[in-house]
Amino acid sequence: MTRQRFLALGLTAAALLGLVALARALPGWWAAPAAAAFAFAALLLSFLAPVVLEPLFNRYSPLHDAVLAAELRDLAEQAGVPVRDVLVQDASRRTRKANAYVSGLARTRRVVVSDTLLEQASPAEVRLVVAHELGHRREQHVLRGTVLAMCGVVAATLVVWAVLGTRVADPHRVPLVLLLGLGLSLVSLPALTFISRRWERRADRSSLELTGDRAAYESAFRRLARTNLSDLDPPQLLYLLLFTHPTPPERLAAMEAFSLQTREAR
């Protein structure tokens, strides 16, 4: 079992134990404090993950390419999301997939680039991928995602309350609570993947606005499609239910549309 799965199981078990304990202590009105506690936990995780959880699963080192590091810092300043550090993640220990992301808030914010991306991509492509991630921050997607998660756990708590009420205090009802959670996840999945794809398109557009580099955009997403084994033409139902990102052909078509809009605006 990986450490990530062990942590997920531990957090789930803690949440269930807390839920049962609250239902026993406050049988008539456990839902309100439970919803508040779960919402606070979702908020806390969004703050703690970059500085506490990520180092448990990955090793980080400074980016030794001083020129590229300076360019990425300048890009972050241009996006309005200045970063403290530019780090390299040792992703190659586990995968060949290439990635980058921006983690942390305020003084803990940093750009993280996987060593696989540095090995496989040109500096221009690395800048483009990082610009995409900075676009998520510029568009406030992390904050919106946190708010969405908080609303989700509150809604799930209220559904469990409506279905089980005081029976949640019975530990034998825990499997039913898990089943309700699974059902709610499946029901909400199409909406969540739709939102995710929309945010990815906005971040793609931001990457073009920040870099103005169409060639790097095209080559980066073609390279990522090959490296990450992306499905170029998934079945529509599968796409609607499971795909959190637009397909590579959609992303390239969006680039052409953006370029056309830019030319027409001049």
Residue ranges, per PLM feature:
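Polar-ligand-bearing catalytic/cofactor-coordination segments
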Residues: 1-169, 190-266
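Generic long, charged, amphipathic alpha-helical segments
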Residues: 169-188
